[in-house]
A protein has these predicted regions:
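P-loop NTP-binding core
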Residues: 1-191
Length: 191
């Protein structure tokens, strides 16, 4: 909870924007989030700094837990990254139910902005089948796939080990190009 209260003190400026890094200790403190009314802790913490930024991006793990719920309560939009694999489709139904529940009780304006396919290889039949199925699921979720997909690349797998973004580690790679196009598409959709 200390980190939540002192958000301004832990902001780290970078050349791409300010970040508040997470670490393994965040999950250790998750029990504090289970008290009544704790779904809005992140929203409250960000309210102090929200006016200073055009966009605040909250990166969450794929798990649907109280930390993720906090992110949903604090957000206007959700972007769903999904690797181009069949098993990735399974969690979308549960995600929709969770978002609907948050919308009903905690954040009526939240909206799924779209589904972003990652590790995409348009030359494989599987990736194209997953894309078709994801398009169908997206319609059921009242959203759409992003036109841009993040192509698969060794550089995307390697960069976390080097502690760098794709723009630093492999700035001329296809995924770096894809992410730039994706950011433009997000800004367009938000308007």
């Amino acid at each position: 909870e200390m980190c939540i209260r002192d958000s301004r003190e832990i902001i780290c400026p970078t050349e791409y924007g300010d970040i508040i890094p997470s670490d393994i200790t965040l999950s250790a403190g998750v029990k504090e989030f289970y008290e009544k009314g704790r779904e809005s802790l992140l929203k409250e913490a960000l309210s102090d700094i929200g006016d200073e930024y055009d966009y605040i991006i909250i990166d969450t793990p794929p798990a649907l837990n109280i930390l993720t719920i906090n992110a949903y309560v604090a957000s206007d939009y959700i972007i769903v990254p999904m690797s181009s694999e069949i098993l990735s489709l399974v969690g979308l139904t549960q995600l929709k139910e969770t978002v609907d529940s948050v919308r009903l009780s905690l954040n009526p304006q939240i909206r799924i902005l779209g589904i972003l396919l990652t590790k995409f290889n348009s030359r494989t039949r599987l990736a194209n089948e997953v894309k078709e199925m994801a398009e169908s699921v997206a319609l059921q979720m009242d959203t759409a796939l992003f036109d841009n997909k993040i192509r698969s690349s060794v550089s995307v797998s390697e960069m976390p080990a080097h502690g760098m973004s794709i723009f630093k580690y492999a700035p001329r790679s296809k995924p770096a190009e894809d992410y730039l196009c994706f950011v433009r598409e997000v800004i367009e959709r938000i308007g």
